[in-house]
């Protein structure tokens, strides 16, 4: 399980599943490479598959889904910034082990993501922040420049 693999130990910051945003309005998949995916000292970059999902919800929430081996997904999620059109204010990380029998683990976070337009060629998603006071996280992905699939 990805949550165990990460050994984050942040059960105090877990957000209830009923707080998950409804109303998906858009989902794109882009190809490229993970530049970095890590929590604290756990570097997960080598487990990335080269695919990134980008989800947009009706309430302004955006999720960047870093696809990992063994069907695991590392998601950085937050509300679209009102000050910057290409930024997201991160408020949670979602760890999904890919098994239908297990619910994803949602962990409160603080940070931000910036991104470019995937329809205009190569672009980079860069996310960074903290889980609680002690755990840093970083997640970045560079697309290969091909148009996204919807």
Where are these regions (language model features)?
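Residue-level signal for mature regions of secreted extracellular proteins and peptides
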Residues: 3, 27-28, 41-42, 106, ...
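Bacterial N-terminal signal peptides
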Residues: 2-9
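A short, surface-exposed beta-strand/turn
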Residues: 78-84, 137-150
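An ectodomain-focused feature that recognizes extracytoplasmic/extracellular
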Residues: 18-89
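Sec/Tat signal peptide C-region and signal peptidase I cleavage site
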Residues: 13-17
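Acidic, glycine-rich flexible loop segments
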Residues: 88-139
């Amino acid at each position: 399980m990805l949550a165990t693999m990460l050994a984050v130990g942040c059960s105090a910051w877990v957000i209830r599943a009923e707080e998950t945003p409804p109303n998906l309005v858009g989902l794109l998949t882009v190809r490229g490479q993970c530049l970095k995916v890590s929590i604290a000292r756990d570097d997960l970059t080598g487990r990335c598959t080269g695919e990134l999902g980008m989800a947009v919800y009706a309430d302004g929430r955006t999720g960047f889904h870093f696809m990992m081996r063994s069907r695991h997904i590392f998601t950085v999620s937050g509300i679209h910034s009102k000050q910057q059109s290409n930024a997201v204010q991160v408020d949670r990380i979602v760890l999904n082990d890919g098994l239908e029998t297990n619910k994803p683990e949602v962990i409160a976070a603080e940070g931000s993501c910036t991104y470019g337009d995937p329809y205009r060629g190569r672009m980079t998603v860069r996310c960074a922040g903290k889980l609680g006071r002690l755990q840093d996280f970083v997640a970045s992905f560079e697309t290969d420049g091909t148009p996204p699939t919807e």
